[in-house]
A protein has these predicted regions:
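Conserved HGGG/HGGXW glycine-rich cap/lid loop of the alpha/beta-hydrolase fold
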Residues: 7-71
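Short beta-strand/loop motif that positions the catalytic acidic residue
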Residues: 211, 217-219
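Catalytic NTP-binding/metal-coordinating core of nucleotidyl cyclase/transferase enzymes
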Residues: 273-351, 355-356
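Conserved acidic catalytic loop of the alpha/beta-hydrolase fold
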Residues: 82-100
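Post-His helix in hydrolase/transferase enzymes
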Residues: 230, 252-268
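Helix-rich cap/lid subdomain of alpha/beta-hydrolase
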Residues: 129-197
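Conserved hydrolase catalytic core segment
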Residues: 98-138
C-alpha cells in the first residue's frame, strides 16, 4: 500500500518519507520526533485509521532530520523548528505536491503551524490532533502530564510508554513489540533526553494568529497528558479555527478503538460531507474445532455412515453455539469456525462441544484466541483468525487450547488452565504462550 522509504533533500540533509498511492488530496502526517516512517504505516494499531484516511487522499509519512530513517544530526547541531518545517517543503517538492493538508500530532503541531503560517498557499488545511502550543505553560493540567517525560525516559524502547499515554488502545505483547521496534528505530534513549529538552522550550503562540488557513482542532476529552485546555488555546489563537472535543483518553487519535469519530470530523471538514465509516473491526473470541482422526474414520465408516456422523456432529456443535450465544462463521468438512463476544462463554462452549460429541464416539480438538477481527459480510478475517487457527492446529485430542491473551481475560472466572509452554505459530510473528483448559 505504501511506497518503499525514499528521500527528499532538505538543505544538506536527506528526509525519509513514504507515501500511499495518489488520491484526491495530499495529507501529510507531520511527525513528532519519536516516529519512524519505515515502521509507522505497518503498526497493527493504526490500520483501520490508515484505510479510512487513504480513502480521502494520499497519506504521506516522513521523518524529521535526526530521527527515524532520515539523516542523523549531532546533538549540538539539532535542527531548528524552521528546518523541521522545511522538511515538509522538501517532501512536497519531491512528490510534486503543490498543496497539502497537514495532520499534526501533539508536539508536531509546532512545525505544522509554522509551515501553515509561512506557506498558506501550499496549505489546504491544518488539523491539530491533541496539539499544544508550548509544553511548559500552565494549562491547569493534572499530575499525569508532569510524569510523561519521566515515563518516556525510563520506558523508551520497550513500547510500554505508548500504552501509558494511550490507555484505551488494545494491548498485548505483539502490539507492544511493534511499538517498541518503532521507538528503537526512531531515536536512541540518549536522543530522547536531548529531544525532550529541545521541544520543552518550543512556543508557537505568537505564530498562531498568523495562521490563515482552514484549521480543525480535535481533542480527546479525557486525555490526562495533553489536556483539552491545550487544544482550546490553539483554537482561540487561530482565526476561525474549529474546535471539536471527542470522547476518549488516548493521546493518539489514529489508534484503535477511538479513531472513527476523529476521522469522521476530518472527512467532513475536508470534503464537506460526513463520511460513513463501517464498523468493520471488532474484538471477538474466535473458536476453531475439528474432529480428531477424521480421515481415518471416514475411510473406516464409508461415505454414508461418515456423512450421517458428520450431520450428528454438526447438530451438536450448532446446539452448543446457540446455548452459549456463539455465531457460526463457517464449516469446513469436519470443522467449525465461530465467534463470541464473551471470552468465558467461548471457552465453556468449546468444553461443552468436546464433552457432548463423545457420545457419538468421536473426539474433537479446539483452539481459541481473542483479538481484533475484520468483518467481511458474514465472514471474518485478520491476524486474530490466523492465530486461532494455529492454536487449534497445536491442540491434541479433547484439548481446549487457548492463547495467553484469552487466558488473561478470564482470570477470576473459575476456569483452570494447564501451561503448555511457548510456541511459534506458523505465519505469525513472535512466540505465543499457550494454555489448555484444565477445568472439569
Amino acid at each position: 500500500m505504501f511506497s518503499e522509504t525514499r528521500y527528499a533533500l532538505n538543505g544538506d540533509l536527506r528526509v525519509a518519507y513514504r507515501a500511499s498511492p495518489p488520491g484526491e488530496r495530499d495529507i501529510v502526517f507531520v511527525p513528532n520526533w519519536f516516529t519512524c516512517c519505515e515502521i509507522i504505516p505497518e503498526l497493527p494499531s493504526i490500520q483501520g485509521w490508515l484505510e479510512a484516511m487513504t480513502s480521502i487522499g494520499r497519506v504521506i509519512f516522513f521523518d524529521h532530520p535526526g530521527t527515524g530513517a532520515s539523516d542523523p544530526v549531532a546533538p549540538d547541531a539539532l535542527p531548528t523548528l524552521e528546518q523541521w518545517a522545511d522538511g515538509i517543503t522538501a517532501v512536497m517538492d519531491e512528490l510534486g505536491s503543490s498543496e497539502v493538508v497537514l495532520y499534526a500530532v501533539d508536539g508536531a503541531f509546532a512545525s505544522a503551524a509554522l509551515f501553515a503560517a509561512t506557506h498558506p498557499s501550499r496549505t489546504a488545511a491544518l488539523i491539530a490532533a491533541e496539539g499544544y502550543t508550548d509544553p511548559l505553560a500552565d494549562y491547569g493540567q493534572g499530575p499525569e502530564s508532569e510524569k510523561a517525560g519521566e515515563a518516556m525516559l525510563t520506558m523508551w524502547g520497550t513500547g510500554q510508554f505508548q500504552h501509558v499515554v494511550n490507555p484505551d488502545m488494545p494491548w498485548n505483547d505483539d502490539i507492544r513489540a511493534s511499538w517498541a521496534r518503532m521507538e528503537r528505530l526512531a531515536v536512541s534513549p540518549a536522543a530522547v533526553e536531548v529531544m525532550l529538552a529541545l521541544t520543552s522550550e518550543l512556543n508557537v503562540r505568537a505564530v498562531l494568529p498568523s495562521v490563515r488557513v482552514p484549521t480543525l482542532v480535535l481533542h480527546h476529552r479525557d486525555d490526562a497528558f495533553i489536556t483539552p485546555a491545550m487544544g482550546k488555546l490553539i483554537a482561540d489563537l487561530i482565526p476561525d479555527a474549529k474546535y471539536v472535543e471527542l470522547p476518549g483518553r488516548n493521546m493518539y487519535q489514529f489508534v484503535e478503538p477511538h479513531w472513527r469519530p476523529s476521522f469522521q470530523q476530518i472527512a467532513e471538514f475536508l470534503t464537506g460531507h460526513q463520511a460513513e465509516v463501517a464498523d468493520d473491526r471488532v474484538l471477538a473470541t474466535v473458536l476453531f474445532t475439528d474432529i480428531v482422526d477424521s480421515t481415518r474414520m471416514a475411510a473406516e465408516l464409508g461415505d454414508r455412515n461418515w456423512h450421517a456422523l458428520l450431520d450428528a456432529h454438526d447438530a451438536v456443535v450448532r446446539s452448543q453455539l446457540a446455548r452459549f450465544r456463539g455465531r457460526e462463521v463457517s464449516t469446513s468438512g469436519d470443522g467449525f469456525l465461530a465467534t463470541f463476544d464473551g471470552p468465558q462463554r467461548a471457552i465453556r462452549c468449546a468444553m461443552a462441544i468436546r464433552d457432548a460429541v463423545q457420545a457419538l464416539g468421536i473426539e474433537v480438538r479446539a483452539g481459541l484466541h481473542t483479538g481484533e477481527c475484520e468483518v467481511r459480510g458474514d465472514d471474518i478475517g485478520g491476524i486474530a483468525v490466523h492465530i486461532g487457527a494455529r492454536v487449534s492446529a497445536l491442540a491434541g485430542p479433547n484439548d481446549v487450547l487457548v492463547s495467553s491473551t484469552l487466558r488473561d481475560l478470564v482470570i477470576g472466572s473459575g476456569l483452570e488452565f494447564e501451561d503448555r509452554g511457548t510456541h511459534q505459530l506458523k505465519g505469525v510473528p513472535g512466540e505465543w504462550h499457550l494454555f489448555a483448559v484444565d477445568s472439569p
